[in-house]
Curated annotation (Swiss-Prot):
Name of this chain's protein: 4-galactosyl-N-acetylglucosaminide 3-alpha-L-fucosyltransferase FUT6
Cytoplasmic side of membrane: 1-14
Region spans: determines site-specific fucosylation: 73-112
Family: Belongs to the glycosyltransferase 10 family.
UniProt-annotated location(s): Golgi apparatus, Golgi stack membrane; Golgi apparatus; Secreted
EC nos: 2.4.1.152
Organism: Pongo pygmaeus (Bornean orangutan)
One GO molecular-function entry: 4-galactosyl-N-acetylglucosaminide 3-alpha-L-fucosyltransferase activity
Name of one Pfam family that matches: Glyco_transf_10
BP GO annotations: glycosphingolipid biosynthetic process; N-glycan fucosylation; protein N-linked glycosylation; protein O-linked glycosylation
InterPro entries tied to this protein: Glyco_tran_10_C, Glyco_tran_10_N, Glyco_trans_10, GT10-like_C_sf
PTMs per UniProt: N-glycosylated. Proteolytic cleavage releases a secreted glycoform of 43 kDa.
Signal sequence bounds: none
Membrane topology label: Single-pass type II membrane protein
Amino acid sequence: MDPLGPAKTQWSWRCCLTALLFQLLVAVCFFSYLRVSRDDPTVYPNGSPFPDSTGTPAHSIPLILLWTWPFNKPIALPRCSEMVPGTADCNITADRKVYPQADAVIVHHREVMYNPSAQLPRSPRRQGQRWIWFNLESPSHCWHLKAMDGYFNLTMSYRSDSDIFTPYGWLEPWSGQPAHPPLNLSAKTELVAWAVSNWRPNSARVRYYQSLQAHLKVDVYGRSHKPLPQGTMMETLSRYKFYLAFENSVHPDYITEKLWRNALEAWAVPVVLGPSRSNYERFLPPDAFIHVDDFQSPKDLAQYLQELDKDHARYLSYFRWRETLQPRSCSWALDFCKACWKLQEESRYQTRSIAAWFT
């Protein structure tokens, strides 16, 4: 009989027990890592953190965090029920301290596109928290779209196929008689204006303008042209019969404040360069604007504008739609409320590929 037998047996059991405890510890650490990774979009950037989640708000009144102000410009945030009576409310804040409790996070693309890995939220993501990708720029001016894939559950943009449609403007019927006075033609003392902040000589809109101004006088306002002091834009542009609502790039539904504010609020007929005429007609009557594509050349457009300048009846026909419709411009506060209402209407939790969609 081996005198060391009992000791060997005891030692073997201790080794086995130690090995089992070690394996158990490794398993606990591994599954803990998986749990944290599942909560953290920086670990699984290409998949839904919680694919089985319903996205149901954790609070009776949903809490929405504005991770970034659009263009770093804070605004007042009135209650949604004050903006549109009878609608639901949310608690909307830009205080990042509420991130762990937020039901939704709105991220405006421009403020995170330069370094997404550092500028997107990096803390673990609460289960069911929905991220909303908010964007006001065209794809031509959006960087690192691929880096957004796998993070966001809802899209919010000027594109009509967004989950949350936030156009730059729209038309809506008058609730009663039109509240505006008839157009005062005698106040229209100038012909064509264009206000442009980003002057790129090789851009399509600048090249078209240069060809047009060879046949027609165009007053250009902006950094490199005539000054347009703050607060005087509408007063200045309202003196013109036509306004060049030329977009900086051509993409579906990309119809910006150049039309909705600069032209329509100034009661100038918009001359548009952007998406197709049929795209514009999804949002405007066909006789509410003039499209550059309707003419074979800038020279032909110049001739047409000069004809309208002399023919008051034809010129006034571009305002006939105002008898039944009125233009409205967007506000970011209303956009945030649209997100609030969408979150309460729909509990679906999905993961969108931003890069594949936003082209």
